[in-house]
């Protein structure tokens, strides 16, 4: 069936999908057509937000239907994802497990635990204080190291 997805900024695209297609799959198609990252998309049908795990047929979306696309600001997405990560026990992530093993080699169990907890708090605090400018600078350094190196050499002379 043919669907039209219209962003609030005025861009729109037509997509060919199956009636029982997952909303998450539709978001990937929209991402390809409109160049909007999936995690920044919120699709609406008749004013109702569509859940990723549901199918288009669950919302009675038929041929020639029109869906609205709301693009969430990246800052909001990052904040939401940060909150979700805090709900998960951060000590379960592989990097924290690895750090825990290293600390255990050099400290008693109690001291290693306290150092790990403080390190996690400091890490979370540092991440929460990053601005978009900070993130842009970091990304530029990773993506264009030759420019950063040239700038540093220029400033050192």
Swiss-Prot record:
There is a cross-link at residue 48 (Glycyl lysine isopeptide (Lys-Gly) (interchain with G-Cter in ubiquitin)). GO terms for biological process: post-translational protein targeting to endoplasmic reticulum membrane; regulation of protein stability; tail-anchored membrane protein insertion into ER membrane; ubiquitin-dependent protein catabolic process. Its main location: cytoplasm. Signal peptide: none annotated. PROSITE patterns: UBIQUITIN_1, UBIQUITIN_2. One of its GO terms (molecular function) is protein-folding chaperone binding. It is found in: Cytoplasm, Cytosol; Nucleus. The keyword Phosphoprotein applies. Polyubiquitinated. Ubiquitination by AMFR and deubiquitination by USP13 may regulate the interaction between the BAG6/BAT complex and SGTA and therefore may regulate client proteins fate. Keywords: Cytoplasm, Isopeptide bond, Nucleus, Phosphoprotein, Transport, Ubl conjugation. GO terms for cellular component: BAT3 complex; cytoplasm; cytosol; membrane; nucleus. Component of the BAG6/BAT3 complex, at least composed of BAG6, UBL4A and GET4/TRC35. Interacts with BAG6; the interaction is direct and required for UBL4A protein stability. Interacts with USP13; may be indirect via BAG6. As part of a cytosolic protein quality control complex, the BAG6/BAT3 complex, maintains misfolded and hydrophobic patches-containing proteins in a soluble state and participates in their proper delivery to the endoplasmic reticulum or alternatively can promote their sorting to the proteasome where they undergo degradation. The BAG6/BAT3 complex is involved in the post-translational delivery of tail-anchored/type II transmembrane proteins to the endoplasmic reticulum membrane. This is Ubiquitin-like protein 4A. The gene is Ubl4a.
